[in-house]
Amino acid sequence: MKELLIRNERCLGCRSCELACAVEHSQSRNLLGAISESPRPRYRVHVTSRGGDCLPLQCRNCEEAACLDACLSGALQRDERGIVVCDTALCVGCFMCVMVCPFGIITVAEPERRIVKCDRCPERAEPACVSACPTGALIYQEIDTAARERRSAVLERLKGTM
């Protein structure tokens, strides 16, 4: 299964991922149209910065997702890809999922009073945020491939110290 992985050392805090996400989830699916939409489209990835370090955060689709357990109406479900998705027609706006998310990533869209969370852009081969990232801080790949690449990188660094 593919996961959205973060290489935080590469994030510049440019927020290209946020913009691409909002445009992808807009009605027009283009920047000019998205800017003029009302209400404005919401992004689902959040670039957080502190002390010069930046980190793009989005739903981690936790194995034991507290939001799924907290959802009173059954609006939150795990789809066939393993992604936690929201059926807005079932959502009653209790926002229990917002309160229990350990990452603070599920947010509320006003004035619709519905939740907004990353859905991994199901119509795309890779999420819009990944495609938009100019530094490769966000990658979408199989966990095994990512682990193998990290091990190779560690080996290369170790070779340089010997």
Question: What does each of the following model-derived ranges do?
Answer:
Residues M1-E9:
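N-terminal beta-strand motif that seeds the catalytic metal site of vicinal oxygen chelate
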Residues N61-I83:
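Ordered, amphipathic secondary-structure segments that act as subunit-interaction surfaces
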Residues M1, Q27-D69, A89-M162:
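Flanking helices and flexible, charged tails adjoining ferredoxin-like Fe-S electron-transfer domains
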